[in-house]
């Protein structure tokens, strides 16, 4: 039987994971960019989508209901939708604007919380096992002065702590919750970094295994492993995929 993955986001890591998962299974995409969601759905084939803002509790509830209406069940959830709020004023702690902090926490941390809450509600009601993978960041574990965005790092740290706490609670009923923590990845969100020659040079040394930024496909491959039954003994883990970031000066 094909397994159903509910995934948030429609570009970058989300798009790469959806394409890889849909080669053998079913995908339901949740995102706030209708055109991107539609294009990705058409590209991967075995997929459907619902346009929704993950910060909105009712929109999240409706999106999960739409997935259930379409496929009858949800086997796995990958929360990858997120933002960087640098353009809104995120930065070093003494410079970070409160509005930027609120925005990035709202999208990244609250959005992940709401999606987990809704899907876990379905699973616990139906006595169903399942797997959740949330998206953290290497910046929550191994900070770098050149990437000092306190709001973003804080939001990812919140996701990691929430995931581990929830994993402990739900493990006895067969629900697994893990985190994937990418290094710097070549996605639309990292466009500013991609355009900066100094950052590009720094990343050659910071992520020596990839000689720079990781690809979205690098993360998607590990994500699919963590979402499949192949990883069934794992829960409460933060799996770092960083091209060598954490072991490089």
List where the protein language model places each region.
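Canonical Rossmann dinucleotide-binding motif of NAD(H)/NADP(H)-dependent dehydrogenases/reductases
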Residues: 1-28
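Conserved glycine-rich Rossmann-like NAD(P)H-binding loop of the short-chain dehydrogenase/reductase
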Residues: 24-39
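Catalytic loop of short-chain dehydrogenase/reductase
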Residues: 83-84, 133-158, 163-164, 168-172, ...
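Short C-terminal tail/terminal secondary-structure segment
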Residues: 84, 224, 235-249
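Substrate-binding pocket helix/loop in short-chain dehydrogenase/reductase
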Residues: 88-93, 97-102, 203-204
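Short, small/polar-rich loop/turn modules that mediate ligand/substrate recognition or access, typified
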Residues: 171, 176, 234-236
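Catalytic Tyr-x(3-8)-Lys segment
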Residues: 198-218
């Amino acid at each position: 039987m094909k397994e159903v993955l509910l995934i948030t986001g429609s570009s970058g890591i989300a798009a790469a994971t959806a394409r890889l998962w849909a080669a053998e299974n079913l995908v339901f995409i949740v995102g706030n960019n209708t055109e991107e969601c539609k294009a990705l759905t058409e590209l991967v084939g075995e997929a459907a989508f619902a346009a929704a803002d993950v910060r909105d509790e009712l929109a999240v509830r409706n999106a999960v209901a739409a997935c259930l209406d379409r496929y009858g069940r949800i086997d796995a959830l990958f929360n990858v939708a997120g933002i960087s709020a640098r353009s809104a004023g995120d930065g070093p702690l003494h410079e970070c604007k409160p509005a930027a902090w609120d925005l990035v926490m709202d999208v990244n941390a609250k959005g992940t919380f709401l999606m987990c809450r809704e899907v876990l509600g379905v699973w616990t009601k139906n006595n169903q096992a399942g797997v959740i993978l949330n998206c953290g960041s290497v910046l929550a574990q191994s900070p770098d002065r050149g990437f000092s965005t306190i709001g973003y790092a804080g939001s990812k740290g919140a996701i990691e702590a929430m995931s581990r706490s929830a994993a402990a609670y739900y493990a006895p009923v067969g629900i697994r919750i893990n985190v994937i923590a990418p290094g710097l990845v070549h996605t639309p969100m990292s466009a500013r970094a991609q355009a900066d020659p100094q950052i590009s040079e720094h990343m050659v040394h910071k992520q020596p295994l990839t000689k720079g930024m990781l690809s979205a496909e690098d993360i998607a491959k590990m994500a699919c492993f963590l979402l499949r039954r192949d990883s069934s003994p794992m829960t409460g883990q933060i799996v770092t995929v960083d091209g060598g970031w954490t072991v490089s000066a």
